[in-house]
């Protein structure tokens, strides 16, 4: 482990599924929006959910998938307002140990949050848990015109923020994002996802964010 992360100068942190759990987002798109859509179109919740899934899947892994303004226009629903609603907002939750992890790593190297979340979504989450003191930059992939599943995003990130990828570690819960980052030149990665994935010479698989600081001791 010490060999893998020797000379790390920059950490790229994902947010959802790494620092925050996915309850908020999953419930919002799978339950709250179909419920609003059902009332708006006077159809059953089940029909609204099927319709929503069909519409959402059409844009999966694209820039529009994460764009609140796009979905507000597409569904004729104020998505930002719905995301701020109490029944949704209260579901924003930190993973246990995430703040402790950030506190242990802050100051040891440059820390950058890189998320697919729209800036409006990020701001809502930061209102509940202000993560900004732990990061040198908080970057929304949307504003670089790509998503993390696209290798071009990583090239844009490297250029915009002058990151030395040879001394950078990416922490993410989506293996495709990790592969794209590595293919763009990122040296190493920590995978915190649910899929079973064996560690390699470039990717260290961990079960919890609590374990991350030990990789940099």
Where are the language model's segments positioned?
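Substrate-recognition element of Asp-dependent hydrolases with the DxDx(T/V) motif
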Residues: 11, 79-93, 98-129, 139-141
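Asp-based, Mg2+/Mn2+-dependent phosphohydrolase catalytic module
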Residues: 1-11, 103, 118-119, 123-217
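N-terminal helical cap/lid subdomain that shapes the substrate entry/recognition surface
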Residues: 4-100
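Hydrophobic residues in well-ordered beta-strands that form the structural core
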Residues: 21, 113-115, 191
């Amino acid at each position: 482990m010490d060999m893998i992360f020797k000379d790390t100068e920059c950490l790229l942190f994902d947010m959802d599924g790494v620092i925050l759990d996915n309850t908020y987002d999953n419930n919002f798109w799978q339950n709250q929006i179909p419920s609003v859509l059902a009332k708006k179109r006077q159809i059953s919740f089940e029909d609204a959910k099927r319709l929503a899934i069909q519409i959402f899947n059409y844009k999966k892994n694209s820039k529009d998938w994460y764009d609140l303004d796009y979905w507000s226009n597409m569904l004729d629903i104020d998505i930002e307002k719905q995301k701020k609603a109490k029944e949704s907002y209260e579901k924003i939750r930190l993973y246990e140990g995430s703040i402790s992890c950030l506190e242990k790593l802050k100051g040891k190297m440059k820390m950058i949050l890189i998320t697919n979340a729209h800036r409006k979504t990020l701001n809502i989450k930061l209102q509940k848990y202000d993560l900004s003191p732990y990061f040198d930059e908080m970057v929304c992939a949307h504003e670089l015109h790509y998503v993390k599943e696209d290798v071009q995003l990583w090239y844009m990130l490297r250029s915009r923020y002058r990151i030395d990828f040879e001394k950078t570690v990416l922490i993410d819960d989506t293996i495709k994002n990790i592969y794209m980052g590595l293919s763009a030149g990122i040296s190493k990665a920590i995978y915190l996802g649910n899929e079973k994935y064996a560690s390699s010479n470039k990717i260290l698989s961990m079960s919890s964010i609590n374990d991350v600081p030990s990789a940099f001791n």
